[in-house]
């Protein structure tokens, strides 16, 4: 038996060593890696080169007079966008329903900060040239003020590298989607080659960058989602050539993305001077006089709201990445929203969801705790067997197996039911970590009978570390109710687990800590009930 335990210990150690990297990556403790076949350094790559399907032409394009550059504003119930008439690049994109802090007078979230303007978000590259700098532009129309259900279009006409360029940007009052229809035509009678690229740029989307909520460059290409958050990798650059549905910059809660309709393209991403830059470039296209083709590209500037993203084109819904156990996380988020509709508090909704999960797994947990209690009663007899046959491991294992058989105890009975619940924990972890509903959602808001702010944002850590410390105490108490490990080394390791988890959870979003704390309390109650009946 001891030999078997030694072998098991070695195997488990190997699993921990190999699996830790995957676990820490999944949990967000270390940046995710990207398959080597998808990674190419863009350091030496020229500025976004693009290829495009035949754009629209206006037979010999008529001459036009460039207009003086000025700001153009688009206002909807969801956001306020400010563009420049010289090519349609973004100057601001402020989200009306999301703010930088929990204070009532907190500024709205601005996805395009001033330092990002220099990389021309919503910019257009033509034959490698930044059209907003090298072209001449005229703007047709005025500001847009859209009410619910309305759409509006801004039209920018330009002359860039011998091509007449017409950008039509359509805005939707009920969505964060911006749709561009791009028309190209030679300014003379001869055909011209056009290479078009769409640019994007933003600063960090997570002020006070947390290891659990990093700003990263992400993309959905060739049917799979990928992302890079490592500063070193992003400063070197990312270069992807493939079938690209969308690419952009995102955090757990917000996304700025470009999504070309014809998806064969080259993606270039880079972090430079604190600004995340993305360009999606289409292949070269011959543009003939009289060409009427239209190039369509979608953009997303807004929160990662599931319903809106799932309704958007180009698989933008895949930006909400819930990891390996997404099939578990998605229904859990739905249940969380269901409870919230009735209680109006996400902290309470998390507790109700935890209770529901505990009830579902009650039979398995009951079996596990009952098996552990039987093992606890067997420990004195097992200790005597180890002492009696300390020099004869084979005989010791035989006697221990005889005891297990006599008292009908399965030594693994306490662990196996728990293992079944691990995927649910990881699924709920990802669900709570990526649920924008928890951003600035209060639980208690203030310490009782005081004005001290506490647990006013379930997406932020507990400012006074009360919940993680109490959680650590519950883990210690739960450990006291659990039979001690027979192996002294294992017992010492288990003794330090509450300390390790407490430090680990200190900076966790408080919503996650509330779940874990509530789960521990329910587990202690269940163990106490089983002990009382024993």
UniProtKB/Swiss-Prot annotation:
Check the record and name the Pfam families matching this protein.
60KD_IMP (PF02096), YidC_periplas (PF14849)
Topology versus the membrane, per the UniProt entry? Multi-pass membrane protein
What is the designated name of this protein?
Membrane protein insertase YidC
Look up and give the organism this protein is from.
Nitratidesulfovibrio vulgaris (strain ATCC 29579 / DSM 644 / CCUG 34227 / NCIMB 8303 / VKM B-1760 / Hildenborough)
| Signal peptide limits | none
Q: Which GO terms describe its cellular component?
A: plasma membrane
Q: Which HAMAP family match?
A: YidC_type1 (MF_01810)
Which NCBIfam families does this chain map to? yidC_nterm, yidC_oxa1_cterm
> What gene name does this entry carry?
yidC
Q: Does the keyword Isomerase apply?
A: no
Q: Tell me how this protein assembles.
A: Interacts with the Sec translocase complex via SecD. Specifically interacts with transmembrane segments of nascent integral membrane proteins during membrane integration.
Q: Which family does it belong to?
A: Belongs to the OXA1/ALB3/YidC family. Type 1 subfamily.
Classification from the root reads: Bacteria, Pseudomonadati, Thermodesulfobacteriota, Desulfovibrionia, Desulfovibrionales
